[in-house]
């Protein structure tokens, strides 16, 4: 279990804290979505969890031990831009480089590489120059490197935001399903409202504070929260929410398809 307790952080020469006494727990096998606007503290939280920054106040524990003593190699990070994380010429070289850095014996590497390439379906691309891979293939390549070293926590920082919706949705399902089978922790930093429905738990950050923690089933009860914090709700959902308030009905748990919302409105306005 990951335990974050009273975590605060202020950058040098900044007057105010970027994070203010953030506390939350994440159980093994749980997928936590962290959502908020730019400036909400999401990026700073990523840097603290990933070991790029040191907390000035508060603690981060994993399985009842401080994360610094456990080692940040327990965390696998998937960033927005895979080119930042891929340093070798080919995926095969990248995997060898990754495994060497984690002290894996050379005699064990071929088996691990074969296993992870099978999972991410890139066996036929392992010797292709990385620069010739598509953006989605590069993200899968980074994910292969993470799978190879078996992290306990997967930290995704806007990892799918540069992909088009079709590829993004397919890659999300693949990544989240794969991690779920391992019973590992996923922390998905996002500004995409649709990601919330893929999570087990959600925390909403605003101006460095944790405003609320809730389950995906409660999203429709939190629409005022999102609306009051000027969050861009999907238009069909926003329309349903506003109409529901006007006619004193509960916002329906609908898809984001406009036709579904229009049908619901017509039914209740008859």
Swiss-Prot record:
SUPFAM superfamilies: P-loop containing nucleoside triphosphate hydrolases
Pfam family, one: ABC_tran
Record-annotated ABC transporter domain positions: 1-232
GO MF annotation: an example: ATP binding
Assigned keywords, A-Z: ATP-binding, Nucleotide-binding, Transport
Signal sequence, start to end: none
Keyword Translocase: no
Organism domain of life: Bacteria
Residues holding ATP: 36-43
Gene3D superfamilies documented for this protein: P-loop containing nucleotide triphosphate hydrolases
One term under GO cellular component: ATP-binding cassette (ABC) transporter complex
Family matches, as InterPro entries: AAA+_ATPase, ABC_transporter-like_ATP-bd, ABC_transporter-like_CS, ABC_transpr_CbiO/EcfA_su, ECF_ABC_transporter_ATP-bd, P-loop_NTPase
Disruption phenotype: Probably essential, it was not disrupted in a global transposon mutagenesis study.
SMART domains listed in its UniProt record: AAA
Family according to the record: Belongs to the ABC transporter superfamily.
Name of the protein in its database record: Putative ABC transporter ATP-binding protein MG304
Organism expressing this protein natively: Mycoplasma genitalium (strain ATCC 33530 / DSM 19775 / NCTC 10195 / G37)
């Amino acid at each position: 279990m990951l335990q974050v307790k009273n975590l605060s952080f202020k950058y040098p020469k900044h007057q105010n804290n970027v994070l203010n006494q953030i506390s939350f727990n994440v159980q093994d096998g749980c997928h936590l979505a962290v959502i908020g606007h730019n400036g909400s503290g999401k990026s700073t939280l990523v840097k603290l969890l990933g070991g790029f920054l040191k907390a000035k106040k508060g603690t981060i524990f994993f399985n009842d031990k401080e994360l610094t003593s456990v080692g940040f190699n327990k965390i696998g990070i998937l960033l927005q831009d895979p080119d930042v994380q891929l340093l070798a010429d080919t995926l095969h070289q990248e995997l060898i480089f990754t495994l060497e850095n984690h002290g894996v014996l050379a005699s064990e590497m071929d088996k691990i590489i074969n296993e992870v390439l099978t999972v991410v379906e890139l066996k036929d691309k392992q010797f292709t120059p990385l620069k010739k891979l598509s953006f989605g293939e590069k993200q899968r390549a980074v994910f292969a490197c993470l799978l190879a070293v078996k992290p306990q926590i997967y930290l995704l920082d806007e990892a799918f935001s540069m992909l088009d919706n079709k590829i993004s949705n397919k890659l999300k399902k693949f990544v989240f399903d794969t991690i779920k089978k391992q019973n590992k922790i996923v922390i998905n930093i996002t500004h995409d409202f649709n990601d919330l429905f893929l999570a087990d738990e959600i925390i909403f950050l605003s101006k460095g504070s944790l405003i609320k923690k809730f389950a995906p089933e409660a999203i429709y009860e939190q629409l005022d929260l999102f609306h009051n914090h000027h969050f861009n709700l999907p238009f069909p959902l926003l329309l349903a929410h506003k109409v529901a308030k006007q006619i004193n009905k509960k916002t329906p748990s609908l898809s984001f398809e406009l036709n579904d919302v229009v049908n619901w409105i017509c039914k209740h306005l008859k």
